[in-house]
Amino acid sequence: MREILNRYTLGGLTAVYRREGDVVELLLVPAGSEGGIARADCAAEPLIQAKLTEDDAPASFSGGRTMRNSPTVKAMRYTGQTAQKSADKTVVVTKLTDPRGLAYTHTLTLYADNPAAEVVTRVENTGSEAHTLEMLSSFTLGSLSPFSEGLAPETLKIHRLRSTWSAEGRLVTEAAEDLQLEPSWKCYSANSVRFGSVGSFPVRGFVPFCAVEDTAHGVTWAAATTLGSSWQMELYRSDMGLSLSGGLADREFGA
């Protein structure tokens, strides 16, 4: 059963942390709308997605399509959360650990004068053995849309910006179903849309931006990342909830 760990509100945005066993997930919703959160019929989305080279590839027929939800993620354990509040911002730091000595830090910052939040992910090897990461998310959001239950067909729109060097972004809007982002009848096979830019061009095919719109409830989750290297964003779905993550390109996409 999913329990509410903490809630924080600032700048018109509410962050809801929910815990299910060792998994802590983050929901970002408009302030005042948290009472409408209904989604609990999908897997809780971990705060951090990561993949170590020594760990097996993820299951669910997803090899070569995604590196999300690997055994690396399943080894993470929640150890605590702190919050520093001031008039202009709230900084929430969540700690996760791995039995191999890896310490993960997820930092969320809410701003009083900005409706957007900032998410930063860090990992430190506190053990004696070397490890190689081949995927680490900067952010990830799951259980989309948290205001729906079940499949909620034809209610999620995906917005992306196609572009290239010295060009304007061209908006492309597609239904989640048109991108095959819907679960199988058994909710086992994982479907993924992974896109981004390989190389130091920040815009090369796509702008580092993606938005998921819940047309049934009038809420949109939009994310952007800024990197001077290969980057990616990824839409993922294996059950009733959709997930959106992004950051550095993983080994498969950025190689």
Task: Describe each region flagged by the PLM.
Residues 2-253:
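Polysaccharide-binding surfaces and accessory modules of carbohydrate-active proteins
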